[in-house]
UniProtKB/Swiss-Prot annotation:
One of its GO terms (cellular component) is synaptic vesicle. One of its GO terms (molecular function) is growth factor activity. Belongs to the NGF-beta family. The keyword Cell membrane does not apply. Residues 4-119 form a propeptide. Its main location: secreted. This is Neurotrophin-3. Seems to promote the survival of visceral and proprioceptive sensory neurons. Keywords: Cleavage on pair of basic residues, Glycoprotein, Growth factor, Secreted, Signal. Glycans are attached at N112. It comes from the Eukaryota. Residues 1-3 form the signal peptide. One of its GO terms (biological process) is cell surface receptor protein tyrosine kinase signaling pathway.
Length: 165
């Protein structure tokens, strides 16, 4: 994927969603067609491929049985998006410090399960009785699709290769 320089100080949620959509589309188009530069509506230039025989034909190269396709991403593209921070996804050039747990019981948060606590306000009031959500930080290893913050169904990439190889 190639990208032109963007104003990194003005990254909005829409531009980041568009960036992630571009990454996903590059992975989908990767094995189908010869390279051709195309410009997306938000101004980012990406490299996509034209359909070979049929638009419905799917190439199986790069897809392992029972897993997801591996997507190659140029490191420079992620460097340009470095200032974006998301509470849900971390794009990093560094490998995680530890592998994901093999079983849920290995996860410390599962061992120390806490129920939601009731909040109390002064006086008699019915607002804010329960916490909206509990923060949970753990590895997800078995997801192939998810729902984004706007409620759209998205594909979860199994692996992203960084660099020129």
């Amino acid at each position: 994927i190639q990208s032109t320089s963007m104003d990194q100080g003005s990254l909005s949620e829409d531009s980041m969603n568009s960036f992630i959509r571009t990454l996903i589309q590059a992975g989908i188009w990767k094995n189908k067609v010869p390279k051709q530069a195309a410009r997306t509506k938000d101004g980012m230039q990406t490299t996509v491929k034209e359909a070979e025989a049929e638009p419905g034909a799917v190439a199986n190269r790069g897809v392992r049985l029972g897993s997801q396709p591996v997507v190659s991403v140029d490191t420079e593209l992620l460097r340009q998006q470095r200032r974006f921070s998301s509470p849900r996804v971390l794009l990093s050039e560094n490998a995680p410090l530890e592998p994901p747990p093999l079983y849920l019981m290995e996860e410390p948060m599962v061992l120390n399960q806490t129920s939601r606590r009731k909040r109390f306000a002064e006086g008699k009031s019915h607002r804010g009785e329960y916490s909206v959500c509990d923060s949970e930080s753990r590895w997800v290893t078995d997801k192939s699709s998810a729902v984004d913050i706007r409620g759209h169904q998205v594909t979860v990439l199994g692996e992203i290769r960084m660099g020129s190889s």
